[in-house]
Amino acid sequence: MEPLKSHTGKAAVLNRINVDTDQIIPKQFLKRIERTGYGRFAFFDWRYDANGEPNPEFELNQPVYQGASILIAGENFGCGSSREHAPWALDDYGFKIIIAPSFADIFHQNCFKNGMLPIRMPYDNWKQLVGQYENQSLQMTVDLENQLIHDSEGNQISFEVDPHWKEMLINGYDEISLTLLLEDEIKQFESQRSSWLQA
C-alpha cells in the first residue's frame, strides 16, 4: 500500500446517518474477485436512477464535489453486514479519508487494512466541518503524522487514531508486509520450539 502521511484534497459531505455497507456497495456487485473497479458501483442505488442515468439529486453527483478525496459522512457510517468490498469501492471511487462522528467497528478496521484513514470526530467538530464544506468546493489537509486537520478557514482540529493503525498507514504496511518485517523473529521463535511440537 502507498504510505499515507498527509493528504490534501477536496472534501465532500454525505450527511446521512446509518449508511450501511449495502448502500456503499450493493450486494449484486460482490461477485467479482478483483479488488479494483468497484468505484463505479459505489452508492449505486443513490448515484443512478432507474434508467442508469446519474441522479442529479444525489449529493456526491453535485459538480462541486467532483474529484473529492475526503468524505465527511454521517453517524454510524459503514454499518450493516461485513464486506471488505465497501472500503474497496470507496477507495476506487477516490476517497482516501473518511470523517464521521462514528463508524461501525468492522468497517472502521477494514478501512485501515485497505490503506484508508477513518477519523472519528467529536460531534461539535464534525458539525463545524459539515457547515463549512456542505455544497462547497473546498480543500482540506489531513496531517496524519501530527493528527491534525487543517480546514478551509485555517483552523486546526486534532483527532485521535490508534498508534498501531497510524504506523501501518504512515509506512504503507498491510498485514502481510508487517508480518514479513518480523520474519527473522518468527524464524528464531520457531527454531526454539520444543521437539515434541514438531510435526
From Swiss-Prot:
Its recorded reaction(s) are: (2R,3S)-3-isopropylmalate = (2S)-2-isopropylmalate
UniProt keyword rRNA-binding, yes or no: no
Give the protein name, as stated in the record: 3-isopropylmalate dehydratase small subunit
What NCBIfam families does the record point to? leuD (TIGR00171), PRK01641.1 (NF002458)
What is the protein's quaternary organization?
Answer: Heterodimer of LeuC and LeuD.
The enzyme's first-digit EC class, named in words, is lyase
Instruction: Tell me which domain of life the UniProt entry assigns to the organism this sequence originates from.
Output: Bacteria
- What is the originating organism of this protein? Bacillus subtilis (strain 168)
